[in-house]
């Protein structure tokens, strides 16, 4: 399958079941078991035009085979828009076919059409396959990511 046979579009209500399957598989890949509340909550965000998360899906032969979730966030270094790609996943059966590249290009086009700015994302240090794609499409930074859980 070539990249030209992949269609990228914004997620729609009819994608719910397949998105849930793929998002669950994404969680397994990162050793996370998403419960129903998380799946329902994220899907609600995706369908809410007022929520900052925008979801794109990749279709091949009429089947959703990947997704990307992106959100605008203020960039204090530029006093303008910035973008964060929260999630990107391709069905393992379709990896290497251009799904990830097509999704990233669609996300970048979306950011450009909505004010531009820097698009950032993270990946696991051992996700070398994804890093090979990302190294072709973006600049690897020297930033180190930290996390701290807060109550609320």
Model-derived regions, located:
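Conserved active-site alpha-helix within GNAT-family acetyltransferase domains
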Residues: 101, 105, 125-144
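Acetyl-CoA-dependent GNAT
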Residues: 10-16, 21-80, 110, 141, ...
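Conserved acetyl-CoA-binding loop-helix of GNAT-fold acetyltransferases
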Residues: 90, 96-109
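Conserved GNAT acetyl-CoA-binding A-motif
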Residues: 112-123
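Conserved G/P- and acidic residue-centered "switch" motifs that form tight phosphate/ATP-binding loops
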Residues: 62, 98, 127
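Short, low-complexity, intrinsically disordered N-terminal peptides in bacterial proteins
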Residues: 1-7, 151-152
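Conserved acetyl-CoA binding element of GNAT-fold acetyltransferases
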Residues: 80-92
């Amino acid at each position: 399958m070539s990249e030209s046979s992949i269609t990228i579009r914004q997620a729609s209500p009819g994608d719910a079941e397949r998105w849930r399957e793929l998002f669950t598989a994404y969680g397994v890949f990162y050793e996370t078991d998403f419960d129903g509340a998380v799946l329902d909550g994220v899907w609600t965000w995706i369908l809410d035009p007022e929520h900052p998360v925008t979801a794109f899906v990749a279709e091949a032969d009429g089947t959703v085979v990947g997704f990307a979730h992106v959100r605008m966030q203020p960039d204090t270094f530029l006093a303008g828009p910035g973008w964060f790609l929260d999630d990107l996943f391709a069905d393992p059966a379709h990896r290497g076919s251009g799904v990830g590249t097509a999704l990233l290009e669609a996300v970048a086009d979306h950011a450009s059409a909505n004010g531009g700015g820097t698009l950032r994302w993270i990946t696991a240090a051992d996700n070398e396959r994804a890093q090979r794609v990302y190294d072709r499409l973006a600049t690897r930074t020297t930033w180190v990511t930290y996390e701290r859980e807060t109550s609320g």
